[in-house]
From Swiss-Prot:
Keyword Hydrolase in record: no
Sequence ranges on the Cytoplasmic membrane side: 46-57, 119-143, 227-239, 293-315
Organism, scientific name: Homo sapiens
Keywords per UniProt: Disulfide bond, G-protein coupled receptor, Glycoprotein, Membrane, Olfaction, Receptor, Sensory transduction, Transducer, Transmembrane, Transmembrane helix
Protein name per the record: Olfactory receptor 8J2
PROSITE patterns linked: G_PROTEIN_RECEP_F1_1, G_PROTEIN_RECEP_F1_2
Disulphide connectivity of cysteines: C97-C179
Length: 315
């Protein structure tokens, strides 16, 4: 108990996707299926890109890390969400909430920059295939991934520290299905200028920088493809980046839908629906996008299923 008879929050209550009792079991089943598909699909991509000799290229190196990020991002959110569908008391501890926010920020920022790195990789592959192995060398790949995770950790530590530096002493009901910065700050009983500024700066900078890389890469990809004289060559060049282009449009489209809404139409309920998409739906879609449209991945899956024991020994 603090001065002024204010009770400091020690746990939060997550409202969830819906507070309708009749929808809890149906929603549990839907999201359980989504999570199991996420685990199976992304573990499949991780395994194939780790064991198959034909997939030891920069493109599949980045794809493996994207699958790891998607799997981890869903795992930060989904298990607690699924449990809350089945229990009456939908609480999460203060420190558990801080850990969930930090984990979510790490992996969502990592996904943003991994997609940007993959766009650069596709640009180099189409723009200068002869220099591809030199420009996007294993050392460069490791450096890009290391910088991605470093920026993700910096963002997560800074933003989550700012969000939990303010006081929570009134309502503890979060209108969300996981601990996110905006609905948390809406509950604060102290000045939120610093954490709101930190959220704005980091989210804006990360999103803007990665989008610039993606847009410049794809602008140059389109220019390069248009300069190819044969229709067969253009089709082959386009097919090498089609899967990534679809993933980028789906992911950034969801984020832009959430961040570019007019203030008058903005609501936490709308944010929840967008969050469902990029925390639980996109991690299911990415393995499908990259496998169904990718002959190399489909061939690798066939080789793995023909002799899984031999393939696993190559890990």
């Amino acid at each position: 108990m603090a001065s002024g008879n204010l009770t400091w929050v020690t746990e939060f209550i997550l409202v969830g996707v819906s507070d309708d009792p009749e929808l809890q079991i149906p929603l549990f089943l839907v999201f359980l299926v989504l999570y199991l598909l996420t685990v199976a699909g992304n573990l499949g991509i991780i395994t194939l890109t780790s064991v198959d000799p034909q997939l030891q290229t920069p493109m599949y190196f980045f794809l493996r890390h994207l699958a790891i990020i998607n799997l981890c991002n869903s795992t930060v959110v989904a298990p607690k969400m699924l449990v809350n569908f089945l229990v009456t008391k939908k609480t999460i501890s203060y420190y558990g909430c801080a850990a969930q926010l930090g984990g979510f920020l790490v992996f969502i920022v990592a996904e943003i920059f991994t997609l940007a790195a993959m766009a650069y990789d596709r640009y180099v592959a189409i723009w200068s295939p002869l220099l591809y192995a030199v420009v996007v060398s294993p050392k460069v790949c490791r450096l890009l991934v290391s910088l991605t995770y470093l920026q993700s950790l910096i963002t997560a530590l800074t933003v989550s520290s700012c969000v939990f530096s303010v006081s929570y002493c009134s309502s503890n009901i979060i209108n969300h299905f996981y601990c996110d910065d905006v609905p948390l700050l809406a509950l604060s009983c102290s000045d939120t200028y610093i954490p709101e500024t930190a959220v704005f700066i980091f989210s804006g900078t990360n999103l803007l920088f990665s989008m610039i890389v993606v847009l410049i890469s794809y602008f140059n990809i389109v220019i390069t493809i248009l300069r190819i004289r044969s229709s067969e060559g253009r089709q082959k060049a386009f097919s090498t980046c089609a899967s990534h282009m679809i993933a980028v449009v789906v992911f950034y489209g969801t984020l832009l839908f959430m961040y570019l809404q007019p203030r008058s139409n903005h609501s936490l309920d709308t944010d929840k629906m967008a969050s469902v998409f990029y925390t639980l739906v996109i991690p299911v879609l990415n393995p499908l996008i990259y496998s169904l449209r990718n002959k190399n991945v489909k061939d690798a899956l066939k080789r793995f299923l023909d002799n899984p024991c031999r393939s696993l020994k190559l890990m």
